[in-house]
UniProtKB/Swiss-Prot annotation:
<protein>
    <recommendedName>
        <fullName>DNA-directed RNA polymerase subunit omega</fullName>
        <ecNumber>2.7.7.6</ecNumber>
    </recommendedName>
</protein>
<keyword id="KW-0240">DNA-directed RNA polymerase</keyword>
<keyword id="KW-0804">Transcription</keyword>
<keyword id="KW-0548">Nucleotidyltransferase</keyword>
<comment type="function">
    <text>Promotes RNA polymerase assembly. Latches the N- and C-terminal regions of the beta' subunit thereby facilitating its interaction with the beta and alpha subunits.</text>
</comment>
<comment type="subunit">
    <text>The RNAP catalytic core consists of 2 alpha, 1 beta, 1 beta' and 1 omega subunit. When a sigma factor is associated with the core the holoenzyme is formed, which can initiate transcription.</text>
</comment>
<dbReference type="InterPro" id="IPR006110">
    <property type="entry name" value="Pol_omega/Rpo6/RPB6"/>
</dbReference>
<dbReference type="InterPro" id="IPR036161">
    <property type="entry name" value="RPB6/omega-like_sf"/>
</dbReference>
<dbReference type="GO" id="GO:0003677">
    <property type="term" value="F:DNA binding"/>
</dbReference>
<comment type="similarity">
    <text>Belongs to the RNA polymerase subunit omega family.</text>
</comment>
<dbReference type="GO" id="GO:0003899">
    <property type="term" value="F:DNA-directed RNA polymerase activity"/>
</dbReference>
<keyword id="KW-0808">Transferase</keyword>
<dbReference type="GO" id="GO:0006351">
    <property type="term" value="P:DNA-templated transcription"/>
</dbReference>
<dbReference type="GO" id="GO:0000428">
    <property type="term" value="C:DNA-directed RNA polymerase complex"/>
</dbReference>
<dbReference type="Pfam" id="PF01192">
    <property type="entry name" value="RNA_pol_Rpb6"/>
</dbReference>
<dbReference type="InterPro" id="IPR003716">
    <property type="entry name" value="DNA-dir_RNA_pol_omega"/>
</dbReference>
């Protein structure tokens, strides 16, 4: 079973697309050498990013929409 579960993570974000973007950006940071915010048994950046989100270490803020033109 995958930990943390998708159900657990979906309660923390507004959509699955936000979850994917958040995890991908954090995984990229980890690959670039940024410090892990949680201890993990995994060495995979995406798994570590999802564990950080589940632990409440990652946050996001929705930006204001801008007018087109």
């Amino acid at each position: 079973m995958i930990k943390p579960s998708l159900d657990q993570l979906m309660h923390l974000v507004d959509s699955k697309y936000t979850l994917v973007i958040l995890a991908a950006r954090r995984a990229r940071d980890l690959q670039d050498g940024k410090h892990q915010m949680v201890e993990s048994k995994s060495n995979k950046p995406v798994t570590i990013a999802l564990e950080e989100l589940a632990a409440g270490k990652l946050f996001f803020e929705r930006g204001k929409p801008t007018p087109l033109g």
